[in-house]
Amino acid sequence: MKKIIFFFLTFSLLAACDDFLEESPPTGLTSDKLNDLVTMRALNNGAYKNFREFYAYATTIPSLAIGDSFMLPNDGAGNYIQATTWTTTGFSQVLTGNMYTSAMSAFHNVNYIINADLTNMAGTENEKNAVLGDAHLIKAILNFTVDKFFTRNASGNSFPLLNTVVGPNEKVSLSTSIALRAQAETDIELARQYLKQSAGVNTYMAATAFAAKIYFFHKNYDLAYELANEVINSGQFSLESDMSNIYLNGDTSTETILTIVTDLTDTTPSNWGGYATVNFDRFEASKSTGLFTLNPYSLVAQLRNADPSDLRFTQLFEEKDGFVFMASKYPTNETDQIIVRLPEMYLTRAESNIMNSNSVTSTDVADINVVKNRAGAADTITGTPSASAMLDIIYNERSKELCFELFDRLLNSVRLEKDIVDQNGSTYSYGDYINKLYYPFPQEEIDYHNFEE
């Protein structure tokens, strides 16, 4: 399989392991019994399950913060207001607890696997490689994401660096962005190494695509280009002709490379809808029950006005009751969470090549036109633009293609130090927002661990 999948299994081992790592060891399940590959897979599955909550609000909050979304005054708006007042107060702790606590649980699971003695466990080398590949990919995604959300620009301090299992009474300290970035790169390369030998829940190509994302946002454009190129040239993925099928099909879409798949057939109390439920409810195309509409002051709205026939707007956005809704990216409450898909690889390959050479090639133009042509865009590129003009084109293209998918618009604006807007259309420069748009730690964690930011 090519995607990250949540196995919402009902067998008792997974439930027990998940509880063990998140709370205290239940009777009869102690560390000396967590010593076989079946248990290691169960721990990975528990970490996959944590992703549902980890990414639950990773689209809604950033889209408000960057001004892409406008919030309706309906039920559920209360806490989200905190994401629109960052200009004066920064982000509120009420917005960030889910990501912090679910990350800690997932780190706990995968660090147990990585530090376990798999060599002496029964099983083939391929089976062990698959388990380790899954664990390192999960850990790479976690470190990449917490760095982007929890790092304080002024000090460089960030989320704790977790490479071992943290005991129930053990304290941790803050790490740095530099350390988290280095660890993400180490883990993604280990994931690629193990998954190349044997696919687990994830595959080598899924890890390679996420590696391209990591290096791109770390501004290592040589490696970003190389890995995006490898994914594209693998021939394993192709663009959908009907864009709505991407989100309806999710994991089975021909262009999705790395996806978190949800299965709500599990009815255990801990199984809530997470990202699927949150995004379906919040982006619902209803003036009375939906919550997020397109902010008319946003860059995305301006791009839509400039080319209203673009299929990314006609097939995925809906005008209704005087608002523009983005419901088609989250068509059901079981929608899969797409992390990487093929268009991002084309955009990454082209931009990385230009960043490296400060020049534009015909291949760069072709990469962007592949994405534009699929969308029926009116502004396909002719000739060879200058490097600066082409980078502007790619920024706009990435904004159209990946808006309201996780947090790409926010991360990309920060990477390029672009201006953003608020709900009312006021413009904020990079200097205005970079020391405010970060996630605070939960107060109880600050108090217990004596975090000094």
Language model features with spans:
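Membrane-proximal, proline-rich intrinsically disordered regions
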Residues: 17-63, 379, 418-453
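Short, surface-exposed recognition loops and adjoining beta-strand edges that mediate ligand/DNA contacts
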Residues: 28-32, 58-77, 152, 156-160, ...
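Inward-facing hydrophobic residues that define packing positions of alpha-helical scaffold repeats
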Residues: 44, 107-110, 114, 181, ...
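Conserved, well-structured interaction surfaces
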Residues: 78-149, 189-198, 332-342, 352-355, ...
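TPR-repeat structural position
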Residues: 181, 221, 359-361
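Elongated scaffold/linker segments in the mid-to-C-terminal portions of large proteins
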Residues: 230-359, 367, 416-453
